């Protein structure tokens, strides 16, 4: 023990210590009261003159020694004494390698922010020092340089504000993020706000197209409209009023201390009912792009153009839903700040402060464009979630339009233009073409179709009643039609009538875009006489180029009553009283022809469920004999419609044969208007009119389907009882007041006219009966005199001459007379090439010396292009039904000749 103690004492020599302190006192002479107790003197700190290497001492273990290595500088003699900051400097120098290693690892994963900017050094503060921490401070950017506003300015500086139309700029978010030295999510925030204003548009993933500010005023105009419809101005006023009420309540007499009362929290609750236009809780509605559009709307609808941040947050973020979690609300407010920073960089808003009773509030003022008067009214495609009500209404109109077009048959679409019809002249009759309609019915402008339709309808109604009291030139059918419509009636090249009564009035009526009706009415001295019926003995003319179906009511002896209504399918506007554009009344007209139904073959109407669909006429299974003198009236689609069925039924009904097989023969009606129209109410009103006046005429107009050529006809739906009463010997002459109207695509054809008042038939050659009907009886068929079909002439009821536009065709012999009517009519097919070569075609009815009888007429079978009911089947087989069809042959005598080149 003693040896060990001696050894310890030898190592620590008190004598040496005392000598050292004496030398120190002599040299420095700065310290006072030095205690030199030998028993207590132990070296607690290293000596100043001779620094001790602690690692070489045996009594210091590694745990007791410092971790940091000793630098070479520390081995040198230090002149300054130990200070309180000496340990801090040692710690900083020891930690600096770790800081450097950590920064090097960060450089491997991301670029240094704002590394390539030239003005970084000028904006940074110089840190004095030569340590590693000073170098890091130099490289680190400030918060201002990392702000979204400054980043947006750098982003916008890369692209032109108004690029050329031919210049296409593509933005790659990855390249922009690398060049600007920021993360890609920061670029996403900028691009989303720019996309809300249509400055950019998404092309692909992380690829956007740059459009510039060309469409910015139009976009702002659209957002202003949407904001007005969303009633954002009322919501802001309501919020401000509630805040004022809350202020008065808190700082009023009841609350003097100014502390918030938890019972007043209900005044701050803005439920969903306060904002009927608030969107649902969808993630898309809360996106930055949608929120940016709504934020701009608040400025555009505000009168002061100043919006505080809290009001915008309550309206756009829907505080009532995020009230339990205030952190989410604060996050959304930060999103509003991001939007405001981008809008500030675009020079649309600037930050201001609004001073209120509670202090200053952050707000933003709109400094962008406010006058949109010079901008056209075209709406841009704003997102559907901004205004779902408007989008739903627009798309609903398009769906309804498409449904109506697809619900009806292809041939019953609106009549096409004449150019399209002429291109389909030689098409197959049974192949309806549902081609592309005109621009008014295009789905590409479905949202504007209703506006154009209303404009055309209003203008046409006004012009119809103005022209009703005007007196244009006497004998010209020149209706005034709206410019918007492409289905205008083309005026005839020559006068319509050359008769004694030359005082005519022409007016036009149009319902929607369904077609025009031009009717010359006899002139009168007063407005009361203008309501006289056009179906007089000398002027029963109705020229209807493009209507689908109408019925014309008129009395034989006197004019129509003013209460005669006129309506077309799909509209209820009034046109002059002698026209009634209504659906056919099947049941009523069938009951009036009961005496003839007994002699007819079994013909049944279609079932109830087919009444609203396009009707079809079906011939019996076995065709009639050639000696029956089947004389079908050719309708607009080139097929024959029996006058028997047309006159007896009052229309062209839909019938079935004995086996029930339905063959579409003649298109009758089309539901081109309102599909929800109730036909039963119209039938009942028509029944009352017929029972009042038995001599009332109902004219049924059957139009040809679009693209098919032929003749349109106007048949009477009602006859007096004595005109249809059959005799015991044979079927007498059947008075058919009818009008033949050509297809509207074949040029200004005339009307084949038959007077509507029954009377004696003149058998003198070269004369046309003035007061009698066009007699299609068995014995008087050949006594009918002249009929004319001419592109520029009209039948003269009182003149014995035939007006023709071409004098050399006046004496032209009939071309290949019809085998059904030898010496009666000669017809050139309008769709044939022969018709194209001859601008005027004349049909002259030759007088036979003796009345033709069924036995004296021999019929030859010829193959025709249009398979009309009269030309179906073998001629020998048709002769077998001669006797059974005697009663029905009086009305089936007209057939288009097949002599023209096919």
UniProtKB/Swiss-Prot annotation:
The protein's name: Transcription factor E2F7
Keywords of the record: Activator, Cell cycle, DNA damage, DNA-binding, Nucleus, Phosphoprotein, Repressor, Transcription, Transcription regulation
Residues with PTM Phosphoserine: 96, 411, 832
MF-aspect GO terms: cis-regulatory region sequence-specific DNA binding; DNA-binding transcription factor activity; DNA-binding transcription factor activity, RNA polymerase II-specific; DNA-binding transcription repressor activity; DNA-binding transcription repressor activity, RNA polymerase II-specific; identical protein binding; RNA polymerase II cis-regulatory region sequence-specific DNA binding; RNA polymerase II transcription regulatory region sequence-specific DNA binding
GO terms classed as biological process: chorionic trophoblast cell differentiation; DNA damage response, signal transduction by p53 class mediator; hepatocyte differentiation; negative regulation of cell population proliferation; negative regulation of cytokinesis; negative regulation of G1/S transition of mitotic cell cycle; negative regulation of transcription by RNA polymerase II; placenta development
Composition-biased stretches (Basic and acidic residues): 253-269, 589-611, 679-690
Biased composition (Polar residues): 884-902
Annotated stretches, region: Disordered: 253-283, 418-439, 589-627, 665-690, 844-902
Subunit annotation: Homodimer and heterodimer: mainly forms homodimers and, to a lesser extent, heterodimers with E2F8. Dimerization is important for DNA-binding. Interacts with HIF1A. Interacts with MN1.
Organism, as annotated: Rattus norvegicus (Rat)
Domain notes: In contrast to classical members of the E2F transcription factor, atypical members contain 2 DNA-binding domains and regulate transcription in a DP-independent manner. Both DNA-binding domains are required for DNA-binding and are proposed to form an intramolecular structure that is similar to the winged helix structure of the E2F-DP heterodimer.
């Amino acid at each position: 023990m003693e040896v060990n103690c001696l050894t310890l004492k030898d190592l620590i020599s008190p004598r040496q210590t005392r000598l050292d302190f004496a030398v120190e006192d002599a040299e420095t002479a700065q310290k006072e009261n030095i205690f030199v107790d030998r028993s207590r003197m132990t070296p607690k700190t290293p000596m100043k003159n001779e620094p001790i290497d602690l690692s070489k001492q045996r009594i210091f273990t590694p745990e007791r020694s410092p971790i940091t290595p000793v630098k070479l500088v520390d081995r040198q003699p230090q002149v300054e004494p130990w200070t309180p900051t000496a340990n801090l400097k040692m710690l900083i120098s020891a930690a600096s390698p770790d800081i450097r290693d950590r920064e090097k690892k960060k450089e491997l994963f991301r670029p240094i922010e704002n590394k390539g900017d030239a003005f970084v050094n000028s904006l940074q503060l110089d840190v004095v020092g030569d340590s590693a921490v000073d170098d890091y401070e130099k490289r680190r950017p400030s918060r201002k340089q990392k702000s979204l506003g400054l980043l947006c300015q750098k982003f916008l500086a890369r692209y032109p504000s108004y690029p050329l139309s031919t210049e296409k700029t593509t933005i790659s978010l990855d390249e922009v993020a690398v060049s600007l030295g920021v993360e890609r999510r920061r670029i996403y925030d900028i691009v989303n706000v720019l996309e809300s204003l249509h400055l950019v548009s998404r092309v692909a993933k992380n690829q956007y197209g740059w459009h510039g500010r060309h469409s910015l005023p139009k976009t702002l105009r659209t957002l202003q409209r949407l904001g007005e419809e969303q009633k954002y101005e009322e919501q802001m006023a309501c919020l401000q009023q509630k805040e004022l009420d809350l202020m008065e309540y808190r700082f009023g007499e009841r609350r003097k201390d100014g502390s918030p009362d938890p019972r007043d929290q209900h005044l701050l609750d803005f439920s969903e009912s306060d904002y009927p236009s608030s969107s649902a809780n969808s993630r898309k509605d809360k996106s930055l792009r949608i929120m940016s559009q709504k934020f701009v709307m608040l400025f555009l609808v505000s009168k002061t153009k100043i919006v505080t941040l809290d009001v915008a947050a309550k309206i756009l973020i829907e505080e009532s839903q995020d009230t339990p979690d205030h952190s989410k609300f604060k996050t959304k407010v930060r999103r509003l700040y991001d939007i405001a920073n981008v809008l500030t960089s675009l020079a649309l808003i600037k930050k201001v402060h609004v001073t209120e009773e509670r202090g200053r509030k952050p707000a933003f003022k709109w400094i962008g464009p406010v006058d949109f008067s010079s901008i056209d009214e075209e709406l841009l495609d704003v997102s559907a979630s901004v205004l779902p009500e408007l989008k739903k209404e627009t798309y609903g109109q398009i769906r309804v339009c498409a449904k109506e077009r697809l619900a009806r048959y292809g041939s019953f679409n609106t009549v096409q233009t004449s150019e399209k019809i002429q291109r389909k002249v030689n098409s197959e009759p049974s192949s309806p073409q549902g081609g592309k309609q005109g621009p008014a019915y295009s789905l590409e402008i479905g949202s504007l179709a209703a506006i154009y339709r209303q404009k055309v309808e209003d203008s046409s109604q006004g012009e119809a009643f103005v022209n009703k009291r005007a007196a244009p030139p006497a004998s010209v059918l020149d209706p005034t039609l709206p410019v918007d419509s492409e289905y205008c009636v083309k005026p005839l090249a020559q006068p319509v009538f050359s008769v004694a009564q030359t005082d005519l009035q022409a007016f036009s009526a149009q319902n929607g875009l369904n077609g025009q009706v031009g009717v010359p009415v006899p002139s009168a001295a007063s407005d009361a006489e203008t309501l006289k019926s056009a179906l007089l003995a000398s002027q029963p003319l109705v020229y209807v180029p493009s209507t689908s179906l109408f019925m014309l009511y008129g009395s034989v002896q006197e004019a129509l009553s003013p209460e005669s209504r006129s309506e077309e399918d799909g509209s209820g506007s009034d046109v002059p009283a002698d026209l009634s554009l209504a659906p056919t009344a099947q049941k009523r007209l069938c009951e009036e022809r009961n005496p003839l139904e007994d002699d007819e073959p079994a013909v049944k109407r279609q079932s109830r469920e087919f009444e609203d669909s396009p009707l079809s006429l079906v011939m019996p299974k076995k065709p009639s004999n050639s000696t029956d003198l089947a004389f079908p009236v050719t309708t607009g689609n080139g097929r024959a419609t029996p006058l028997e069925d047309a006159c007896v039924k009052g229309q062209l009904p839909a019938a079935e044969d004995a086996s029930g097989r339905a063959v579409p023969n003649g298109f009758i009606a089309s539901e081109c208007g309102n599909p929800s129209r109730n036909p039963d109410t119209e039938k009942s009103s028509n029944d009352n009119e017929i029972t009042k006046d038995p001599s009332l005429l109902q004219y049924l107009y059957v139009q040809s389907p679009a693209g098919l050529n032929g003749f349109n006809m106007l048949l009477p739906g009602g006859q007096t009882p004595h005109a249809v009463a059959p005799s015991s010997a044979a079927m007498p002459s059947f008075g058919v007041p009818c009008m033949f109207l050509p297809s509207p695509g074949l040029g200004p054809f005339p009307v084949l006219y038959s007077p509507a008042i029954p009377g004696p038939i003149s058998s003198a050659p070269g004369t046309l009966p003035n007061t009698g009907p066009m007699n299609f009886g068995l014995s008087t068929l050949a006594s009918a005199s002249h009929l004319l079909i001419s592109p520029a002439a009209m039948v003269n009821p009182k003149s014995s001459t035939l007006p023709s536009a071409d004098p050399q065709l006046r004496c032209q012999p009939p071309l290949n007379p019809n085998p059904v009517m030898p010496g009666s009519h000669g017809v050139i097919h309008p769709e044939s090439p022969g018709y194209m070569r001859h601008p005027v075609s004349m049909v002259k009815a030759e007088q036979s010396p003796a009345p033709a009888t069924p036995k004296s007429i021999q019929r030859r079978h010829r193959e025709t292009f249009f398979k009309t009911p009269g030309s179906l089947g073998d001629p020998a087989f048709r002769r077998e039904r001669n006797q059974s069809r005697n009663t029905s042959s009086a009305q089936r005598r007209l057939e288009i000749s097949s002599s023209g080149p096919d």
